[in-house]
A protein has these predicted regions:
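Mid-to-C-terminal functional-domain signal that highlights helix-capping/loop sites
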Residues: 1-239
Length: 239
């Protein structure tokens, strides 16, 4: 998700095509082409410019609705429905996941090309966390560059959030509290405070504190690797 303002001018974008198996956007005002995954202009008058990212979550509607009960949902375009077109089905990822990947000779086979990864970029470093790793172990405590982070899998076993795990200069270690009916809960070893999936402490010495959110990009391995060639992969090790 990107801000649409460049040099004080609001740009309007349309889908223009695909480059390296990733969407290209074209702005009406200058005709510049922008790469969707990076927000960078790759052709045209604004080539080399970078759109400013807007923080967002990629979570299930059920989790979003539970956290934002008064939230609004974008209404479907009536013109699309009237023209007989259909919106992408809810299980579109299952279909896409079975599609073949057109790749060059430099294929990184450490993971299957359609393996879903949660990509984190911090401190000039990029790390790919396979969704399957989080489904086996959550939370994941890690360092991305010099930044201490924690990744948490939601109750739906599909939504993932990441946070910097430092409070007042102190690194926190987390484990998931089990046997509770009140939703996902994490406890930090240092203070015993209890935290929710939003990264907010609601009980204990740190009650009311909020962990700093870290952007997580849900992507296929082949695409993440293409735009983050120096990425590492988080490894759970033998299990």
């Amino acid at each position: 998700m990107w801000e649409t303002t460049v040099d004080g001018r609001v740009l309007h974008f349309h889908l223009a095509g695909i480059n390296n198996q990733n969407f290209i956007m074209r702005d009406e005002e200058t005709g510049t082409w922008w790469q969707q995954v990076s927000g960078k202009a790759i052709h045209g008058p604004l080539k080399g410019r970078q759109l400013k990212g807007v923080f967002h979550d990629e979570i299930s509607f059920a989790i979003w609705k539970s956290e934002q009960p008064q939230g609004r949902v974008l209404k479907p375009d009536e013109h699309i429905a009237a023209a007989g077109n259909k919106y992408v089905p809810a299980n579109w990822e299952e279909t896409v996941g079975r599609m073949r990947v057109v790749a060059g000779t430099d294929v990184d086979r450490r993971l299957g090309p359609r393996t879903l990864v949660m990509g984190v970029t911090l401190d000039g470093k990029a790390v790919a966390y396979p969704l399957t790793a989080l489904q086996k172990q959550s939370p994941i405590i890690d360092m991305v560059g010099s930044a201490p982070v924690v990744l948490v899998l939601g109750e739906d076993k599909r939504s993932v959030r990441a946070f910097e795990r430092t409070v007042d200069g102190r690194k926190l270690e987390f484990f998931q509290k089990t046997g509770q009916d009140a939703g996902l809960q994490l406890i930090d070893l240092e203070t015993g405070s209890t935290w929710n999936f939003e990264g907010r402490a609601f009980a204990g010495p740190l009650a009311g504190r909020q962990l700093k959110k870290v952007f997580v990009l849900e992507d296929y391995w082949f695409d993440w690797r293409l735009y983050h060639p120096d990425t590492t992969i988080y490894d759970l090790g033998p299990r």
